[in-house]
Regions:
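HIT superfamily nucleotide-processing domains
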Residues: 1-165
């Protein structure tokens, strides 16, 4: 993706705060909307915290917890709007806070589609790229062919933010 890919992947929160994380779409109120650097399902995004050291939602003060959850909903609406325009097979948006692999607060915002193979539909989307079932191998990495998607997502996030301001 970029020559600094290793750097941003090793500290996604720090690089977002420093303005050097290339996956950041927009700064939200309690975090950063980022496009997934692996696009196992088109439009996959993540909300990452803007609080260094916050490993889970309960690490934040209650008012920041609510802002993070509101930001997650904003990003979810933006992903839903963009993906529905781009693919009539959009079925739903999954919103998940897991954090079992990456030790920083983040929420997965994953579009789910009617065209997903039946053996995958009931699985958490994160398993798609681990198993290779969607592509028969490595999932598509974020690159220049995603520039238009990035632009659309950023514009829609702006619209969603304006609607709640």
């Amino acid at each position: 993706m970029t020559s600094g890919a290793t750097d941003f992947r090793s500290d996604r929160v720090g690089t977002a705060l420093a303005g050097t994380n290339p996956t950041v779409l927009r700064r939200l109120r309690a975090g950063f909307a980022v496009i997934g650097d692996v696009q196992h399902l088109p439009g996959y995004c993540v909300l990452i915290t803007d609080t260094p050291g916050a490993d889970q939602l309960t690490d934040l003060p209650p008012e920041r917890q609510l802002l993070f959850l509101e930001d997650m909903a904003i990003l979810g609406r933006a992903v839903a709007a963009v993906c529905a325009r781009r693919d009539p097979g959009l079925r739903r948006i999954n919103l998940e806070i897991q954090g079992n692999t990456d030790a920083f607060l983040h929420a997965h915002v994953t579009p789910r589609y009617d065209w997903e193979p039946p053996e995958i539909v009931g699985w958490p989307a994160a398993l798609h790229h681990w198993t290779g079932l969607m592509t028969g191998g490595e999932p598509p990495l974020l690159g220049p062919d995603h520039d238009e998607l990035r632009r659309e997502l950023g514009d829609e996030i702006d619209r969603q933010l304006a609607a709640v301001s």
